[in-house]
């Protein structure tokens, strides 16, 4: 039990869809969630606004547990997806685990429709300004598109790493050198490189150098976003993964690139009206 904190799930009444799905699905009906008229809940807006001013607390549990993951800030909010949509719950969880270092290639489909519904995008940032970097590709080439993102990120990280090593050779014995050596040891570890990159940036800002070393320092600071190892993802539905984009997906898997694949398998073409895909079951009724 975590005794030093109090936990509250604060609802923003102005962004509630009013669908009632949360109440229907809640295992503690009448005790935890009850639908009420909007005008009786507007006072909760003050509580919502106050909640946004609170400082972030260190997660007292491992985020890679069912319970611990829910103490992480979601970086997907107010998506505008269909009421009761099951896709957004999974996408939200991914942002709680990896969102502040996440690159996302999204195939056309439902996840693209609610993921970039003009004029807003539901993917957001934390208080440090970090959040998922999202882009969309068509059905047939999203897997290849995501690998292009992977290769681009790898090249940019390799270039920054080379500059860090060059500056390290010129600054032996400094706080930056110690931070850089630790970062290089954990270069390919996502969460460790994130923490170590903060130490590198802080040490760089205090480092007093001139000439070639100053140019290296400026370059690293300007490209500091690439110090942290990125979590690379491709999203798509079963229409993409099983049908239209299967050929590209097959090649990407065979290439053994460091990229994660998330298939939102609804067993139909959800975004275009429920047509059957290769994931559809024989004799099923889809709605």
Regions found by a protein language model. Give the residues of each.
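Iron-sulfur cluster-binding cysteine motifs and their immediate structural context
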Residues: 1-4, 8-12, 17, 21-40, ...
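Non-heme iron-sulfur electron-transfer modules
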Residues: 1-8, 28-68, 130
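Gly-rich Lys/Arg/Thr-decorated short loops/hinges at beta-loop-alpha junctions or inter-strand turns
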Residues: 2-6, 66-77, 140, 198-204, ...
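A structural-propensity feature for long, helix-poor, extended segments
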Residues: 4, 120-171, 272-287
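Beta-sheet entry/capping signal
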Residues: 8, 24, 30-33, 100-105, ...
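N-terminal amphipathic, basic-rich helices that act as targeting or association modules
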Residues: 16, 68-71, 76-119
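Thiamine diphosphate
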Residues: 114-115, 213, 219-287
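N-terminal leader/propeptide and maturation segments of large enzyme subunits in energy/redox metabolism
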Residues: 139-212
């Amino acid at each position: 039990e975590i005794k030093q904190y109090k936990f509250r799930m604060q609802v923003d009444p102005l962004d509630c869809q009013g669908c009632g799905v949360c109440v229907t699905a809640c295992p503690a009906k009448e005790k935890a969630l009850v639908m009420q008229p909007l005008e009786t809940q507007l006072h909760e807006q003050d509580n919502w606004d106050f909640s946004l001013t609170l400082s972030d607390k260190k997660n007292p549990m491992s985020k890679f547990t069912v319970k611990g993951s829910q103490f992480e800030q979601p970086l997907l909010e107010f998506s505008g997806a269909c009421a009761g949509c099951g896709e957004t719950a999974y996408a939200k969880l991914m942002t709680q685990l990896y969102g502040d270092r996440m690159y996302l290639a999204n195939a056309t489909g439902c996840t693209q429709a609610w993921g970039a519904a003009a004029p807003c995008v539901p993917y957001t940032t934390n208080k440090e300004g970090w959040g998922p970097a999202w882009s969309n590709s068509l059905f047939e080439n999203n897997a290849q598109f995501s690998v292009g993102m992977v290769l681009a990120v790898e090249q940019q990280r390799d270039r920054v790493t080379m500059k860090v090593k060059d500056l390290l050779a010129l600054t032996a014995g400094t706080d930056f050198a110690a931070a850089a050596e630790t970062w290089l040891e954990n270069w390919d570890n996502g969460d460790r490189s994130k923490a170590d990159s903060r130490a590198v940036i802080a040490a760089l800002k205090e480092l007093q150098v001139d000439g070639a070393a100053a140019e290296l320092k400026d370059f690293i600071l300007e490209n500091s976003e690439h110090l942290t190892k990125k979590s690379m993802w491709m999203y798509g539905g079963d229409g993409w993964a099983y049908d239209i984009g299967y050929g590209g997906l097959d090649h990407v898997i065979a290439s053994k690139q460091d990229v994660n694949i998330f298939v939102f398998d609804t067993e139909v073409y959800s975004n275009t009206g429920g047509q059957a895909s290769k994931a559809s079951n024989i004799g099923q009724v889809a709605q």
